[in-house]
Amino acid sequence: MLDLLEENEFPKIQKDEQSEILNTIQNFGESILKRSEEWAYISSFPQEDGTTSLKICSYSSGLGIEDDIYLRFGKYHIGDQSEKQIVVARISFKKRKSGYGTALLKTLCEIGERYNYVSLHIEEPNLDCKAFMKKIGFKEDKFLPILKLKESIEEYESRKRF
């Protein structure tokens, strides 16, 4: 297993992949959170020749607590550093216990499968998030392989139905 890959050896996130990830997150905002305006954006300019990391943020229009998401895709120093990862750096939803967290994780699993991201990591979760993570199947290390996460979500949703 490689400990750390050089920038030029790591798989690049090409411009079309960057755009499609952003569109998928934007669609999540529109269909799940009922946001009508463009609320998510790539925090750096899309790289024509690809990039090893992509940051997607959301912003709030108005005062008060709004839906807030900060995601990173690509090369990070967590787990196996030779594989593409998804990192949930910040997440907060105005409405809690509405299924938004589960829906976001399902969306991220779809992105992971489509673009060969191997694992999802949640950085510095608060107590509410830790409780949710435990229900979904996360352990103390705060990351799961995408395929395991997808299975865990299906099991979680199945348990909730009964």
Question: Positions of the model-derived regions?
Answer:
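Non-catalytic substrate-recognition and accessory regions of acyl/acetyltransferase enzymes
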Residues: M1-S98, K106-F162
